[in-house]
Design a protein with these regions (language model features):
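Extracellular and secretory-pathway beta-repeat/beta-biased strand scaffolds
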Residues: 2-243
Length: 243
């Protein structure tokens, strides 16, 4: 077993960036990024299928529910292929949240552009991605948000916070997520070969974290208080429709 693998098994690595730009580097042990495939975004509860709409390669995802300052989604699958955009809304039926927790049963695979929207035209909000298996952001993948936190919780923790396809996240759970104080899946991994763009921080927590898994990977983690998302939210001729 390599030194990196031993270290990865002993403790989780955490990246916490307030104003950081990274273009390459490896942390933890090398993990395999999923092969290219079709976009497949499904809610865990079929009753919430109507919260996902698609127009011209743009997927608009309303939260399952908004309770106070917390919006939640529970997905069975979240695979976003290149040349596709997913707009994740932090609002629903006149209710607005500043935090969005996305719980995903399967490994998260992002090769398109994910935009977190605090209103119809503005990127923002603290966005959390939780999957026991982890997350891969491919070379063409982009996530735009106020802040980004990705974690690989233990299966036990994940199951306790998912009830009949509905996420159960309390204010105290949010405090634990923010502090990185939840148990992790020993086999979970996060691979970033694409770009994460935020205004108030990037936090990655998993037993294995890789930023730039290949020499030609265009991995970049960027967090700037005055970051302008105007040129980051679209993909070529595919418009996110943010006005």
């Amino acid at each position: 077993m390599s030194t990196y693998r031993k270290l990865a098994k002993k403790q989780a690595l955490r990246l916490s960036m307030a104003i950081v730009t990274m273009t390459s580097g490896v942390m933890g042990w090398m993990a395999t990024v999923h092969a290219d495939g079709v976009t497949n975004i499904q809610k865990a509860d079929s009753a919430n299928a109507g919260t996902i709409t698609t127009t011209n390669n743009v997927w608009t995802v309303a939260p399952d529910k908004v309770e106070g300052d917390i919006a939640t989604n529970a997905f069975s699958k979240f695979t976003l292929n290149q040349n596709n955009i997913a707009n994740l809304l932090l609002y629903k039926n006149g209710q607005n949240a500043n935090k969005l927790v996305n719980m995903v049963n399967d490994r998260i695979d992002i090769r398109g552009t994910v935009n977190a929207l605090k209103n119809a035209t503005t990127i923002g909000g603290d966005v959390y991605f939780l999957s026991p298996s982890g997350m891969a952001v491919g070379r063409t993948g982009v996530i735009n948000a106020g802040s980004i936190t990705a974690l690989t919780p233990s299966a036990d923790w994940f199951d306790k916070h998912l009830d009949n396809g509905q996420a159960k996240i309390s204010a105290s759970d949010m405090d634990a997520l923010k502090a990185g104080a939840i148990p992790l899946n020993a086999d979970g991994s996060i691979v970033i070969d694409g770009r994460l763009n935020t205004q108030s921080g990037i936090h990655l927590r998993a037993p294995a974290i890789t930023v730039g898994s290949a020499p030609d990977a265009a991995a970049a983690l960027q967090s700037k208080a005055d970051l302008d998302f105007t040129d980051l939210v679209n993909i070529g001729s595919v418009s996110a429709g943010l006005g």
